[in-house]
From Swiss-Prot:
EC category name: lyase
UniProt xrefs under InterPro entries: 3-IsopropMal_deHydase_lsu (IPR004430), Acnase/IPM_dHydase_lsu_aba_1/3 (IPR015931), Acoase/IPM_deHydtase_lsu_aba (IPR001030), Aconitase_4Fe-4S_BS (IPR018136), Aconitase_4Fe-4S_dom (IPR036008), IPM_dehydratase_rel_enz (IPR050067), IPMI_cat (IPR033941)
Gene3D superfamilies xref list: Aconitase, domain 3
Cofactors named for this entry: [4Fe-4S] cluster
Matching CDD domains: IPMI
Disordered, as annotated region: 418-442
SUPFAM superfamilies: Aconitase iron-sulfur domain (SSF53732)
Residues the entry annotates as binding [4Fe-4S] cluster: C347, C407, C410
GO biological process assignments: L-leucine biosynthetic process
Function: Catalyzes the isomerization between 2-isopropylmalate and 3-isopropylmalate, via the formation of 2-isopropylmaleate.
Species of provenance: Streptomyces avermitilis (strain ATCC 31267 / DSM 46492 / JCM 5070 / NBRC 14893 / NCIMB 12804 / NRRL 8165 / MA-4680)
Protein's recorded name: 3-isopropylmalate dehydratase large subunit
């Protein structure tokens, strides 16, 4: 019987297999940041152990970093302590670190791919749930806890139970204005935030194959929001073109050998998945969340659902609580929801294609009165590229704030936060209660919807801008 993509990569990394025990996997790339690594380094220090494979370990500062005045001392004592601790630990153990101000600093899941460290057929771990991002390359990538971070630092291996596999097939053409973010939000709404629990998801089909690498990273990034262990997409010519010439990509004969191996990394025709989901791309439209988990979403053209419409009692209760927290009423058109803040950034949508898409919409327009728009590149390198293209000027002229790279408003661990009761349209990945600041209300959207929302002041798509322009044009003009 054939094997799935996930099974092939998993099997290639088994160091030890014994009946009744988890498989022991070799880890090819270990990514670190300041939040989940301090206790792991403490464990090494207490045991007198070194980092086993410094060549496979890299750290960056992202969660706590400010996005303004990065040349000044960090004001928040907790953030400052975590960053200083990471610097101390990396210096003591010899771990490569990209600190604030370094050209390669940024959100860890943006930095890995842009350096060419993330490659097909590898195993990638990080003490961060959105490590699934790297699965876009055909890598087996998943988030781990702090004790597991220590285990990998000490042994470069990890004992893991083998997950099941789920195929999510998306065929057809995505309609104009529908993005990878809309697609993954629709998938999560379809299968639920627990639908992928215990599975590695493989995204496949003609619609997936047509996506750019950055769009594929958006898809795999939010696999965890569906409850999955990881998400993967088989590597292809798009993958190879993205990697070729990057700092850590193979070269010459090694490149040829790598590509030959990478081409074998696809599910066999007779491979059997434990579950399958089929999505028609043509039926999709811009998507937004209305509630307090990523599965509580709907097409932008819809209205806030009535909790009474849910047959399942737990879903009905969750919807009631979500509407109460979000300050919404059943039947309210999603397009009528006004926002205070728009955030474009994060490891989900902070790459150069995302910034280009948002800039194309706000160019020649102004951010609505009373709305704050934050543009935060996913890495310093992305920021430099955006500046070279003049995107920073486009955003500033529209009235948006141009910031330095970092996790920023994705989570309330740095100065970029919502005030209680404030509402955001955010290109990040989680809309939990208080995720962007205590009492903050978050709607997850694509960069295109975020930009249109910033201009109109309420949840909107780029098509709404065209409709408004048409409505303002005098007859006969």
């Amino acid at each position: 019987m054939g094997r799935t993509l996930a099974e092939k990569v998993w099997d290639d990394h088994v160091v030890r297999r014994a009946e009744g025990e988890p498989d022991l996997l070799f880890i090819d790339l270990h990514l670190l940041h300041e939040v989940t690594s301090p206790q792991a380094f403490d464990g090494l220090r207490q045991a007198g152990r070194p980092v086993r494979r410094l060549d496979l370990t890299i750290a960056t500062e992202d969660h706590n970093t400010p996005t303004l005045d990065i040349d000044k001392p960090i004001a928040d004592p907790v953030s400052r302590a975590q960053l200083e601790t990471l610097r101390k630990n990396c210096a003591e153990f010899g771990v490569r670190l990209h600190s604030l101000g370094d050209v390669e600093q940024g959100v860890v899941h943006v930095v890995g791919p842009q350096l060419g460290l993330t490659q097909p057929g590898t195993t990638v771990v990080c003490g961060d749930s959105h490590t699934s991002t790297h699965g876009a390359f055909g890598a087996l990538a998943f988030g781990i806890g702090t004790s597991q971070v220590e285990h990998v630092l000490a042994t470069q291996t990890l004992p893991l139970a083998r997950p099941k596999t789920m195929a999510i097939t998306v065929d057809g053409e995505l309609p104009d204005g529908v993005t990878a973010k809309d697609l993954i939000l629709a998938i999560i709404a379809r299968i639920g935030t627990g639908g992928g629990q215990g599975y590695i998801l493989e995204y496949r089909g003609s619609a997936i194959e047509k996506l750019s690498m950055e769009a594929r990273m958006t898809i795999c990034n939010m696999s965890i929001e569906a409850g999955a262990r990881a998400g993967m997409i088989a590597p292809d010519e798009t993958t190879f073109a993205y990697l070729k010439g990057r700092a850590h990509a193979p070269e010459g004969e090694e490149w040829d050998a790598a590509v030959a191996y990478w081409k074998t990394l696809k599910s066999d025709e007779d491979a059997e998945f434990d579950a399958e989901v089929v999505i028609a791309a043509a039926a999709l439209s811009p998507f937004v969340t209305w509630g307090t988990n990523p599965g509580q979403g709907a097409p932008l053209s819809a209205s806030v659902p009535d909790p009474a419409s849910y047959e399942d009692a737990s879903e009905r209760f969750a919807a009631e609580k979500a509407l109460e927290y979000m300050g919404l009423t059943a039947g309210q058109p999603l397009r009528d929801i006004k926002v205070d803040t728009v955030f474009v950034g994060s490891c989900t949508n902070g790459r150069i294609e995302d910034l280009r898409a948002a800039a194309a919409i706000v160019e020649g327009r102004k951010v609505a009165d009373g709305v704050r728009m934050l543009i935060v590149p996913g890495s310093a390198r992305v920021g430099l590229q955006a500046v070279s293209e003049g995107l920073d000027v486009v955003f500033k002229e529209a009235g948006a704030e141009w910031r330095h790279a970092g996790c920023s408003m994705c989570l309330g661990m740095n100065p970029d936060q919502l005030a209680p009761g404030e509402r955001s349209a955010s290109t990040s990945n989680r809309n939990f209660e208080g995720r962007q600041g205590k009492g903050g209300r978050t709607h997850l959207v694509s960069p295109q919807v975020a930009a249109a929302t910033a201009v109109l002041g309420h949840l909107a798509s780029p098509a709404d801008l065209a409709d408004e322009n048409a409505a303002r044009t005098p007859a006969g003009v």
